[in-house]
Amino acid sequence: MSKIEQKGPEEACCCPPSPAPARAQHKSGCLLCGKPLVYFAETRPLHCEICGKEADANCTCEDGHFVCNSCHESASIAFFVPLLLASTEKDPLALFEQVVALRQVHMHGPEHHIIVPCVLLAAYRNNGGEIELEKALREAVRRASQVPGGICGYWGVCGAAAGAGIYMSILLGSNPVHKDAWPIPQRLVADCLNAIADVGGPRCCKRTGRLAITRAAAFTEELLGVEMPLGKVVCRYFGENRECLFRGCPFFPNFRS
């Protein structure tokens, strides 16, 4: 089991500092105006409309608004970490649906890269896995906060799959020189990426999150003997997703004509 360094009281919270106050945020498209996002062929430095800090940007909205990764995800973390600490839910997909239903979680965005490992860690604990959940969540937030938005299209690695790898790395105490644990999270990430790629694009953070969690639950049972029950998920976000695959998505409702 992973041994995560204990921090002092000032660092004990799982949640990052809140970003500067902003205008009302939209759930889909641009957080500030709701207009569609325009992606660049190359990253460029831009100033965040919320915190004012300069950061590398791979997109703006049609009106040129840019919101950095930290501001995109910080508000949601402050709400879903306490929810997961208090939850007794054993189904990680059900937990994922509870978290993404929070109004602070957007249709797409890097917060999903953090939600995936945190949900899996909570479900692992709730199904009898031995883990100090608060410490594990703190470490998952730290690591997954470094996984930027848009990497599915720019790096060829979906952040949901990377989040599953973070989850398994924390469980096993993996590091770059750990002979036995080192390959295992990478196998899980590869498994998740195969499942995600098989469905096809364009991206949907809800779909890829569910697929990564499903593969991680099966992987966990096979490797560690901790079974996580998985219920059926019927998506209700297709109306908010401009790029929804509709009947091409395994979570799309099977409406009767």
Q: What are the roles of these predicted feature ranges?
A:
Residues 85-117, 202:
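Polybasic, low-complexity association/targeting segments
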Residues 38-40, 44, 133, 199-207, ...:
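Flexible, glycine/charged-enriched surface loops at secondary-structure junctions
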Residues 171-221:
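A structural-propensity feature for long, helix-poor, extended segments
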Residues 37, 55, 67, 75:
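Cys/His-rich microdomains that often coordinate metals
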Residues 112, 150-170:
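Conserved phosphate/anionic-ligand binding catalytic regions in large, soluble enzymes, centered on
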Residues 30-33, 48-51, 61, 68-71:
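Short cysteine-rich clusters marking metal-coordination/redox-active sites
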Residues 5-7, 18-27, 36-44, 59-62:
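Short, flexible, mixed-charge glycine/proline-rich loop motifs
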Residues 10, 27, 45, 58, ...:
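Residues immediately within or flanking Cys/His clusters that coordinate Zn2+
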